[in-house]
């Protein structure tokens, strides 16, 4: 009995490798996804009793793939029609012309905004030119309130919350590293 079990193993080692992946639990391989040309049993992968059942890999013909027209359902268009429709929708003549008209004023607007800031920055930077940005910045409250001006220190000395006499601390007087919001245009730092 052990001799008969060893003979198929020796014959499997002499066989050429199979062109498809084999597993121990796989008994037969079927080409079930193709049409009737390859629906027959190709090879018994494990434990073939003799070489007579083995089909040589050279004998296996490549499967016959059906033409594209037979796979396509009757309602769907062909690939040529789909590609022509896609090409017509992506053509370079008609679609870019409507966006070009609104883009021309949009392209000129950033140019005007880039030209305008140098005319507005010098008046707003004149009060900040007297004191360097590393020194203490002074913020004056609006004219309606009678509280004292808040002094803001640099970020090196830490945040400072000013509390005028007899008043609760204001949220606008708390600063960490940013200058307070001013009603006018901000100074460039």
UniProtKB/Swiss-Prot annotation:
Location of the motif Nuclear export signal: 82-93
Transmembrane segments: none
PTM annotation, UniProt: Phosphorylated.
Compositionally biased residues, Basic residues: 1-16
CC per GO annotation: host cell cytoplasm; host cell nucleolus
Compositionally biased tracts (Pro residues): 178-189
Intervals of motif Nuclear localization signal, and RNA-binding (RxRE): 2-18
Induction: Down-regulated by P30II.
Family: Belongs to the deltaretrovirus Rex protein family.
Protein name per UniProt: Protein Rex
Species of origin: Human T-cell leukemia virus 1 (isolate Caribbea HS-35 subtype A)
């Amino acid at each position: 009995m052990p001799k008969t079990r060893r003979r198929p193993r020796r014959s499997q080692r002499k066989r050429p490798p199979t062109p498809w992946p084999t597993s121990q639990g796989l008994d037969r391989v079927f080409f079930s996804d193709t049409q009737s040309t390859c629906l027959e049993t190709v090879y018994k992968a494990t434990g073939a009793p003799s070489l007579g059942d083995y089909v040589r890999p050279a004998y296996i013909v490549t499967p016959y793939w059906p033409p594209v027209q037979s796979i396509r359902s009757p309602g769907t268009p062909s690939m040529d029609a789909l590609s022509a429709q896609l090409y017509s929708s992506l053509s370079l003549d008609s679609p870019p012309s409507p966006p070009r008209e609104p883009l021309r004023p949009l392209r000129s607007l950033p140019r005007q905004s880039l030209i305008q800031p140098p005319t507005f920055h010098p008046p707003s930077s004149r009060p900040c030119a007297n004191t360097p940005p590393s020194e203490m910045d002074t913020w004056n409250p609006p004219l309606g309130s009678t509280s004292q001006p808040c002094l803001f220190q640099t970020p090196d000395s830490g945040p400072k919350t000013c509390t005028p006499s007899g008043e609760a601390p204001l949220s606008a007087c708390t600063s960490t590293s940013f200058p307070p919001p001013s009603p006018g245009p901000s100074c460039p730092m």
